Amino acid sequence: MRRYLRVVGLCLACGFCSLLYAFSQLAVSLEEGAAVGRRPQAAVASWLADGGRGTGRGAGSAGPGRTGRCKEVSLSYWNPYWMLPSDVCGVNCFWEAAFRYGLKTRPTEKMHLAVVACGDRLEETVTMLKSALIFSIKPLHVHIFAEDQLHDSFKDRLDSWSFLQRFNYSLYPITFPSDSAMEWKKLFKPCASQRLFLPLILKGVDSLLYVDTDVLFLRPVDDIWSLLERFNSTQIAAMAPEHEEPRVGWYNRFARHPYYGRTGVNSGVMLMNMTRMRRKYFKNDMTTARLQWGDILMPLLKKYKLNITWGDQDLLNIMFYHNPESLFVFPCQWNYRPDHCIYGSNCREAEEEGVFILHGNRGVYHDDKQPAFRAMYEALRNCSLEDDSVRSLLKPLELELQKTVHTYCGKTYKIFIKQLAKSIRNRYDTPPKER
C-alpha cells in the first residue's frame, strides 16, 4: 500500500511541476508577442536615425537562426541537465550552437599601399604593383598619386587586372598646400615630398604602407603589414636604417642637420599608423610648443631647406631625431638597396633569410651598373599575373643572376632569390587548405 501511495505522490508532484511549466511558457509567449509587436517600429526608428541607409543587420536583429527568446546569458548559469529555460539561448552549448548559429566572422582586413609616380615612372610603378599582387593574401587597396597626364595610362594598365578580386585602386592628383606648392614641388625630386602629406590627404585611412616606385616585393605585403602589430604605444611609423655600416654611411659623414640614430633612416619603404601620426604632438627645435603633423612640416622646411640634400627623407630624419620613441626600426632586408652590397655584403639579416623587399634606387633597374638588380626588375616586369608564369619565373632568373657574379652584388645573388623561391612555393605550390 505504501508503495502505491509513493507512486501516486510522485505522479502528483510531476503533474504539479508540469502545470507550473505550462503557465511559465504561457507568460513568456505573451511577453514575446508584445515584444514582436514593438520590433518593427524600433527597426524603422533605427533606420530613420541612420539617415535612411540600408546598413544591413542592426543591433536589434536576431541573427541567423536566432529567435526573440535569446538573451546574452551563458548556459553555465542555468541547469544544463534537463533543458534550457525558454528565454535563454545555449550560446555555449555545442548542440544548440551548431544548429542555431553561424560562425561570427570578422571582415577581412584590407591593406593600404601608397605610391607617388611622376615623369617616366609608370612602368616602374606597374611592375612594383605586380610584385605586390603576386604574393599578397589579404585584399589590397592601392592609392596612386600621379601627374594628371599619367592617369589614363594607369587606368588602362590596372583595369586589365580586374579579374583580381582582392585588388582595387584609387588615383589622385599631386596635391600640395596652395600657399607653398612650388617650394614642395622643387624639393629633391618632382613629387617626392607628396608622401609627407599622405596622413593629411587620406584622412579616412588608419594605416598605410608607402613605397617608392623602384621597389619590388619578394614576399607578401601581408608580412610587412603585420609589423604594425609590433608597434608599442608610442610608435607611429617604421623604416629601415639608411646604412648598416657607419664607415660608408652618408648621414653620419656628411649631413648638416639632425638625423635619426647612428646612420639615419631611409624613407623608400615606410609603414605608417596615420591615425597616431595625425594625433601626435611632435617635439621640435623651432618652438617650445609641440606641433602636430600638419603644423610642423612648413616650419621645418623653412629652417632646414638650405641644409638638406635628400628632401623629404631628411625632414623625416629631423622629426624622428627629436621624437625617437615614435619610430619602429625594421631590418635592412625589408628595404634592401645597392648600398647593402656594392661595398661588400653588409645586411646580415638578408644573408640569413634572403631579401624581402628590393629597393633599386640610384636608377639601377635601368643601367648596367648593378646587373643583379636589373635582372630582378626585368624578370618581374616581364612576368604576367598568371600562375604558370610565376611558377616558371625562378629558373631563368637564376641563370641571369649567375651572369652577374663579377660584381659585388652579383656575388651574393642567392640572397636575391632565397625568399622569392620560398614565396612562390608557399603561394602556388601549397594546397589551398594548407595556406
Curated annotation (Swiss-Prot):
Domain of life: Eukaryota
Triggers of expression: By E2F1.
InterPro entries found in the cross-reference section: Glyco_trans_8, Glycosyltransferase_8, Nucleotide-diphossugar_trans
Keyword Membrane listed: yes
EC number per UniProt: 2.4.2.42
Enzyme class: transferase
Subcellular location: Membrane
Record's protein name: Glucoside xylosyltransferase 1
Gene: Gxylt1
